[in-house]
Amino acid sequence: MEYINWDNYSLEDLFGDIDNYTYNTEMPIIPADSAPCRPESLDINKYAVVVIYVLVFVLNLLGNSLVIMVVLYSRVSHSVTDVYLLNLAIADLLFALTLPIWAVSKVKGWIFGTPLCKIVSLLKEVNFYSGILLLASISMDRYLAIVHATRRLTQKKHWVKFICLGIWALSLILSLPIFVFRRAINPPYSSPVCYEDMGTNTTKLRIVMRALPQTFGFIVPLMIMLFCYGLTLRTLFEAHMGQKHRAMRVIFAVVLVFLLCWLPYNLVADTLMRLQAIEETCQRRNDIGRALDATEILGFFHSCLNPLIYAFIGQKFRHGLLKIMAFHGLISKEYLPKDSRPSFVGSSSANTSTTF
């Protein structure tokens, strides 16, 4: 073995010109699609959402409590629409109880654990499905009363009770997938969330899981509403009824407000990126997150707008509310109308006029 004499070598011979050596400090370029996606959130946006949630909570409690109070204080038998509106107000009140929890989760993340995640998610879904199913039932009731000028079916109160029970049962069934798969999750780079967890195939299974409930709990009732209210409007135009202008305002409000409040959220949540209609990137994921927040607020607002649309616009509701206030001494009886009827949904079985 040959011996190497290291005394004949210098560092420059071994490693070259160290002083003039250049180091490559540049990091390799990482594609945007491969980079970890950190959710973008601003504290000011979080607190703005919380303020809106509190506002919806207060308006929801006040408006729907008044609706329930006026219906229950009525001294005559309730009309069919009264029963539907009573159930609608109860559904909105149940949803209102979850708003403080959603407000806290916007700031702190989901800190309430899996059981409460399942419960509040269930109440939110039941409120949505029961709301649109009840509205579809109201549209069918108006359709029968005005287009066919008959109340023979809808005047049977026990049928109305069974219909409402069926709506609550169907809403619960449509909401079960959310209840089963929702849990508290701690994702990387963000706060804990309340979301569906179905393993490695969450995205594909979520599409399947949402397709059936959205079809029977959103699209079908919406088509029923559009069909019934469309024919109702045509009948009002052709008959030249005295109350048609008021009825048209309320009917347009029913359809337009529901579409404005819930259609954007369902479009963003259940199509687009989540249905892989557009390519998923980090930036688009954050954009979709912000869009979900904005459209979800619109959907939440619908729960407190219902009393304004289906009750406060109606003259009979105002008369009923004034009677209650006069009975408790809050206002003078001089303010009471002389010919106010107890039912706040002013429908008539003798003709097709309606003051919805």
From Swiss-Prot:
Q: Pfam families, per this entry?
A: 7tm_1
Gene behind this chain? CXCR2
The primary site where this protein sits is: membrane
For the Extracellular compartment, the record's topological domain ranges are 1-46, 104-118, 182-206, 270-290
The name on file for this protein is C-X-C chemokine receptor type 2
Phosphoprotein keyword on record: yes
Give the subcellular location. Cell membrane
Report the domain of life of the source organism. Answer: Eukaryota
User: Keywords in UniProt for this one?
Assistant: Cell membrane, Chemotaxis, Disulfide bond, G-protein coupled receptor, Glycoprotein, Membrane, Phosphoprotein, Receptor, Transducer, Transmembrane, Transmembrane helix
Tell me the PROSITE patterns matching this sequence: G_PROTEIN_RECEP_F1_1, G_PROTEIN_RECEP_F1_2
- Glycosylation: which residues? 8, 20
Lineage runs: Eukaryota, Metazoa, Chordata, Craniata, Vertebrata
A Gene Ontology BP annotation from the UniProt entry? neutrophil chemotaxis
